[in-house]
Amino acid sequence: MTPQVLTILGSTGSIGESTLDVVSRHPEKFRVFALAGHKQVEKLAAQCQTFRPEYAVVADAEHAARLEALLKRDGTATQVLHGAQALVDVASADEVSGVMCAIVGAAGLPSALAAAQKGKTIYLANKETLVVSGALFMETARANGAAVLPVDSEHNAIFQVLPRDYTDRLNEHGIDSIILTASGGPFLTTDLSTFDSITPEQAVKHPNWRMGRKISVDSATMANKGLELIEAHWLFNCPPDKLEVVIHPQSVIHSMVRYRDGSVLAQLGNPDMRTPIAYCLGLPERIDSGVGKLDFGALSALTFQKPDFGRFPCLKFAYETINAGGAAPCVLNAANETAVAAFLDGQIKFTDIAKTVAHCLAQDFSNGMGDIEGLLAQDARTRAQARAFIGTLR
């Protein structure tokens, strides 16, 4: 059996670490070609020592020199690269069959697009790729025969319960709607009057999932679910009026598909990202993920409620941007990323995140976003607008 050759972008983040955990359980199935870890050189060096990739990519020359020194000390022959072009190169290398796209934010877009242009199997954990460039990315993947497999737990759940021959047309398969579940984050029942005083330390403590700081804040505002709505729209060719969100605090049901005959099919499991990662990596097999069995006897209850747009305005913004189309999702993402970074840095209040996004969506922006250069230019303009607005809030 020829092993699948993988590039793992974002290997030092939570998705990357979970991916490597799954890969380590199946050495006969996978070989790691390249790892990319931005600035976490110590963690990346340890990964290189274990998995012996040909290449490791970091952010800049300074971090590359540090990583090279660590690898030389440990006798690891991995070649060190740095910069954005290096990410593109290891994602599109001829030797690579599959690319785990797990770089957080719009920074992951160029490398994901490069993988699509080369017809790779893309394990998509970077939701911003579809939020910022949905039409362009999916058209590029289709034109070059690239398979796009969703790693996000919600989209992976949908992928598992859709008909195996799903052809991007809900009506042809008797599908009424797609239902994304959301935990509601750590502030689901918190008094709204206290939201101004929420700290970054409180916001990053997700009740169920182990995630990075940025996505944890997005979960707290439900901006994450908003981005997932846009992602589902592009992944499954689903119109916004066929996309539902339901809050499910236990995070046991990861998403559902409602069929015309009244059936609702759901995917359940413990909240552990190794399950969707193993599902994607193993297709068409089901392989061991290391995740424990779901113990139904230990579940006290599964509860559901509708989201409150007053509590979670960022979710409302996402529905509006899907309907608006054009550059609106790109603006939403750039404004949110900038605002979350400012919040985590202690510059603004938790409630200022939504205010910043609303401000940027109210600005004039281009409707035509047909190429990567135009998308990145709009992304940069919105980030500048967001930073300027944040400056007025201090």
Swiss-Prot record:
Catalysed transformations (reactions): 2-C-methyl-D-erythritol 4-phosphate + NADP(+) = 1-deoxy-D-xylulose 5-phosphate + NADPH + H(+)
Cofactor(s) essential for the protein: Mg(2+); Mn(2+)
Binding locations of Mn(2+): 152, 154, 228
Alphabetic keyword roster: Isoprene biosynthesis, Manganese, Metal-binding, NADP, Oxidoreductase
Gene Ontology MF: a single term: NADPH binding
Binding site for NADPH: 12-15, 39-40, 126, 128, 212
Pathway(s) of this molecule: Isoprenoid biosynthesis; isopentenyl diphosphate biosynthesis via DXP pathway; isopentenyl diphosphate from 1-deoxy-D-xylulose 5-phosphate: step 1/6
One Pfam family matching this protein: DXPR_C
EC number in record: 1.1.1.267
Annotated 1-deoxy-D-xylulose 5-phosphate binding sites: 127, 153-154, 183, 206, 219, 224-225, 228
The keyword Transmembrane belongs to this UniProt entry's keyword annotation: no
Single Gene Ontology BP annotation: isopentenyl diphosphate biosynthetic process, methylerythritol 4-phosphate pathway involved in terpenoid biosynthetic process
Function according to Swiss-Prot or TrEMBL: Catalyzes the NADPH-dependent rearrangement and reduction of 1-deoxy-D-xylulose-5-phosphate (DXP) to 2-C-methyl-D-erythritol 4-phosphate (MEP).
UniProt record similarity statement: Belongs to the DXR family.
PANTHER family from the UniProt entry: 1-DEOXY-D-XYLULOSE 5-PHOSPHATE REDUCTOISOMERASE (PTHR30525), 1-DEOXY-D-XYLULOSE 5-PHOSPHATE REDUCTOISOMERASE, CHLOROPLASTIC (PTHR30525:SF0)
Name of the protein: 1-deoxy-D-xylulose 5-phosphate reductoisomerase
Organism: Neisseria gonorrhoeae (strain ATCC 700825 / FA 1090)
